[in-house]
């Protein structure tokens, strides 16, 4: 179906917040029903779209009914599907096992929500008409969902039950007849093939406009921060080039930590400049809850006024980026595979901010390296920072192996590279090298590779020595956390991890 007004701000349920919102029913965790209140609160502070995670367990497909019961008058003035939006993130049946039929439940709820909304507000507007499909790797992934909805949900109206009695005579007409599918592209190969995915799907469904979602967090965990930024720039460039044929509105999935995008109220102008080719930006939990509300609201207004640029890379520059990414990934993944057991152990003691199980990531499917399973990106980042080893550092000495033209393109394309490296490396605790060996039993070869990364930063960017009280305290707490973990003092392990997260203003 046609795309309505395109929102520029998208709230997500990513549990990266260190602080808890005042409206939460519990001190440490957002419960299922709290998420309905969360969605309502997001709309009231100017966020135009809420992504509702229908991928995990305990999904609530009655969210719209609960939402409008919060404040009937608000949703009379702010029309869902026209002024503000609710967008499902659905399971990808090509990857999911036991949860794949949650897709059916979620898609079936779309016409139900239409009926509820139309009954209450007397408007012929579908309040939900788009879904996000994670792990999209081909146009067929998208076509499967689009056609399933059209033929298994909407087209059953015309099924004759008996003697000219149709399904629509019993259940009423199904609306909307079609839905828009937003591909969420998360892996390297698919990002480098974004043209084929988008063009082939648009051709198959005769779409003139599309929203395309580019992941930023999982690519960073799977390939490294610098490759993740470069891949997001590559994807945005390709989308800019095809805009004359298929009008597109890219979404970038950014978080507050530098590793996951450094998209926070205190860095909003730099972030919008870095990702200027994107139209819509995700506002994750740390963005919303770890900063003063005036700052959050002001940042939301800035994003809502942001104009997308259409600058793009030359074809030869895109090829250089692909080569640079492939070079960088080699050392990065070698190190991460060795650190995986330590990371997985520490994540057990991170604060849990959501009660229901949300979506899982590429490493959870072991689709990226094939050798290790890692937690979600938020937990991954939280574990690394808690050890005193910012993940932004890992693999950066690979730049020594780059050709001059590759380095030039990296520095030109990743605008805030120096700023981001200096920010994240200020959380490096040099005592982590002893902890890696003594506490986490990491082999010396891997430790030496990490030391080479640190040396590269020292030589090329510098690491702040005058850190200030909070950064010094963070370093001290990371040493205490490693000591507590070594001695199986898991109560204090949890305490130190939370204290550090509060300093950073994000868990991971």
Swiss-Prot record:
It comes from the Archaea. It holds the Pfam family PEPcase_2. Its cofactor is Mg(2+). The keyword Cytoplasm does not apply. It is an enzyme of class 4 (lyase). Its EC number is 4.1.1.31. Catalyzes the irreversible beta-carboxylation of phosphoenolpyruvate (PEP) to form oxaloacetate (OAA), a four-carbon dicarboxylic acid source for the tricarboxylic acid cycle. Homotetramer. Belongs to the PEPCase type 2 family. This is Phosphoenolpyruvate carboxylase. It comes from Picrophilus torridus (strain ATCC 700027 / DSM 9790 / JCM 10055 / NBRC 100828 / KAW 2/3). The gene is ppcA.
